[in-house]
Amino acid sequence: MFRNQYDNDVTVWSPQGRIHQIEYAMEAVKQGSATVGLKSKTHAVLVALKRAQSELAAHQKKILHVDNHIGISIAGLTADARLLCNFMRQECLDSRFVFDRPLPVSRLVSLIGSKTQIPTQRYGRRPYGVGLLIAGYDDMGPHIFQTCPSANYFDCRAMSIGARSQSARTYLERHMSEFMECNLNELVKHGLRALRETLPAEQDLTTKNVSIGIVGKDLEFTIYDDDDVSPFLEGLEERPQRKAQPAQPADEPAEKADEPMEH
């Protein structure tokens, strides 16, 4: 991971045209626990996997309330996410106080992009090490946005970020055509199935490690934790078991291992 003199500061470009400090911040997002966002014609849903630092600690909150029509889920550094969430809450309050209307979701995401871009260009600062999935509902309908430490943001029909999130994205891509016509319960189940793909084979979703956020038409942003998640998990079919690979006979020489793939 050492980049010689090209990763000492965020204002230094490498000869290949890369800013390594931003790439390191993107890696912090990949280390966070997975979260999934998806939407239908009427609702947007966030599903997040919660972690506990130890057996003695409570599970960390992964879905945060921003306004009545907006919520976020996070992957990466929780402290950075808390600061960005407070900024978003203040912008929503300002909109209601000054203009007497809720802040459009796309406008809020644009403000977040502007705020997260500043540390990528100024000496002595570091990028925010957190990725956000933003779910909201406004006059344009439901929205799912993804933001990155690089200050890029994307409007998505469905997205997953965090550790092992590629498995969840594969599920979302396979079933994306079904989401727009789903009712709320079916949409949440799709999110849970996608999130379950990020877990090791010996683990499963429980009321302790799952959090759900829902917003939509005539429904303010609501977070479901602990026992409130039970009705959604009860309707979820059991996880299909993966076939175990047959053991190699001891008297046969082991085949030469494949060369490691480059990352």
Swiss-Prot record:
Database matches in SUPFAM superfamilies: N-terminal nucleophile aminohydrolases (Ntn hydrolases) (SSF56235)
Modified positions (Phosphoserine) in chain numbering: 110, 177
Protein name: Proteasome subunit alpha type-1
Keyword Transmembrane: no
Modified residues (N-acetylmethionine): 1
Main location: cytoplasm
Gene name of the record: PSMA1
GO biological process, one term: proteasome-mediated ubiquitin-dependent protein catabolic process
Lineage: Eukaryota, Metazoa, Chordata, Craniata, Vertebrata
Residues carrying covalently attached carbohydrate according to the record: 110
